[in-house]
Structures are given as structure tokens and as C-alpha cells.
Amino acid sequence: MNLIQQLEAEQIAKFKESKSIPDFRPGDTLRVGVKVVEGERTRVQAYEGVCIARANKGMGSSFTVRKISFGEGVERVFPLYSPNVESIEVVRKGVVRRAKLYYLRGRRGKSARIAERRDNKPAAEAQEA
């Protein structure tokens, strides 16, 4: 591991101590709390939509969230380790078979829906106990 990778790993570890990043994948519906500066005051704005892409590049990791706002598709790329991202909450898990869901850009209505993923792991653990 070279020096840059080592520094990057230390920064990621320091960031994870202060904030927790949930395990999410493309297809999941996320609610991202973003710090917005308006004049002198800052507030947290919720941005809720479907994660359509995730790029894991160390400190440069990012994810793209797409939502429909007033009938218009809006996409926003968030840096995963940004101080402006206050919180990430997984609202719903989705079943998809692709890593990048760019095909959703051309779809409207029912064809753009994503089925919900049901994890059977917690139920299996409950039966063993």
C-alpha cells in the first residue's frame, strides 16, 4: 500500500467514526440529508430518490440519486465522504440486475418501478434462536 492509499484509508476511517454510512446499492431508495447554506444560516434539506449508480473510488466515492420533481427527472451526484452530506437513510431496498440504472432515464410511470427486495436473513436467524 503506497502512501496516498494509506492516507486515504486513514481519512475514511476518521470519517466513519463520526458518521455512519448505511449499506446501500443501486436500486435502493435513499433519503439524503444535504447541508444547504442560505445567507448566514445553514439547514438540512432532504433529497429522496432512487440510487441509480455508485462509484467506489476511495475518498472520491460517489453515488447518483434520481428523483422526479414536478414531473421532471432530476439527478444529483453526491460525494460519499462529503461534509455537506449530513445523513443517508435507506428508505426501501430494490431488486435490480444492473450496477448502473441509466435506463431509468428514458422510462416513465409503471415501467420505471423497481420491485422491493426482501432479505430473508433476519427471519432465518430468528428461527435458529
UniProtKB/Swiss-Prot annotation:
Keywords recorded for this protein, A-Z: Ribonucleoprotein, Ribosomal protein
Keyword Ribosomal protein applies: yes
**Which InterPro entries would you find in this protein's record?**
Ribosomal_bL19, Ribosomal_bL19_CS, Ribosomal_bL19_sf, Translation_prot_SH3-like_sf
Q: Which NCBIfam families match?
A: rplS_bact
Family, similarity comment? Belongs to the bacterial ribosomal protein bL19 family.
Per the entry, what this protein does is: This protein is located at the 30S-50S ribosomal subunit interface and may play a role in the structure and function of the aminoacyl-tRNA binding site.
Recorded protein name is: Large ribosomal subunit protein bL19
What is the originating organism of this protein?
Answer: Rhizorhabdus wittichii (strain DSM 6014 / CCUG 31198 / JCM 15750 / NBRC 105917 / EY 4224 / RW1)
Supply the gene name. Answer: rplS
